[in-house]
Amino acid sequence: MEKVLVLLLVALSVAYAAPGPRGIVINLEEGELCLNSAQCKSGCCHHSSALSLARCAPKASENSECSPQTIYGVYYKCPCERGLTCEGDKSIVGSITNTNFGVCLDV
């Protein structure tokens, strides 16, 4: 009985000592360095220029500039929040040159 009690106390102390949900590789907060949007809590890995480091950023709100979601997962402009659509250039040239920015609209 005494061993069971000690084991229970050890298990509880380990459970309380475990770190919170903050991640090192995934579940990153806004402003932390990222390589892909899947790593960010917000769902957007953003960089301002080709030479800048990408950081997690909030998704674009209504009437803000946006980029359509891509398979690459790193954006110059973040995609729209849930329920909004990015209305803008949908050409192949725009997606190749990364100039296919639009505006988030509630359609």
Swiss-Prot record:
Q: Does the keyword Transit peptide apply?
A: no
In the UniProt record, the signal sequence range is: 1-17
Spell out the residue numbers of the propeptide: 18-22
Q: Does the keyword Signal apply?
A: yes
Look up the domain of life of the source.
Eukaryota
Expressed, tissue-wise, as follows: Expressed by the pancreas.
The entry describes its oligomerization and partners as: Forms a 1:1 stoichiometric complex with pancreatic lipase.
Q: Mind telling me what this protein is named? A: Colipase
Native organism is: Oryctolagus cuniculus (Rabbit)
Taxonomic classification: Eukaryota, Metazoa, Chordata, Craniata, Vertebrata
